[in-house]
């Protein structure tokens, strides 16, 4: 959503970002600010990051299943949740009000909460991303 950057940069949140949004803590990053990578390497990082996010969302739903909770999940909902987990981390999603609403069966409310999830006026690209994720999540209402 935010685009591609061949050069590593700091976002101001203690993370270094590079490629299609791959983020690492500054203190543990293998990349230095200004260091460049190829699109091929960026694509590999994206695949790895998306797999990690998707696996985390799947584990979350598996845990709910194991607890006996029946939760509706469409492909569009899953895709939106993976996008959020990619951007904010699986733990950030797991502990969110979005997930609490889903567990209660309040899917429309969960979808609306996506719009406000970890956004600020500082990052307008993130607000646009959350709008798209919310719309995708709520597509089951159409």
Model-predicted segments: where are they?
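Catalytic nucleotidyl-transfer cores of nucleotide-processing enzymes
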Residues: 1-13
């Amino acid at each position: 959503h935010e685009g591609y950057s061949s050069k590593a940069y700091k976002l101001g949140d203690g993370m270094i970002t590079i490629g299609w949004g791959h983020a690492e803590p500054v203190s543990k990053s293998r990349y230095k600010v200004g260091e460049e990578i190829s699109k091929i390497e960026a694509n590999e990082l994206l695949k790895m990051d998306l797999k990690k996010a998707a696996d985390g969302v799947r584990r979350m739903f598996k845990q709910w299943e194991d607890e006996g909770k029946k939760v509706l999940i469409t492909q569009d909902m899953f895709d939106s949740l993976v996008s959020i987990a990619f951007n904010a981390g699986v733990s950030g999603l797991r502990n969110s009000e979005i997930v609490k609403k889903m567990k209660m069966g309040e899917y429309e409310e969960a979808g609306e909460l996506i719009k406000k999830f970890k956004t600020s006026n500082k990052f307008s690209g993130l607000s646009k991303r959350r709008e798209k994720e919310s719309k995708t999540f709520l597509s089951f209402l159409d």
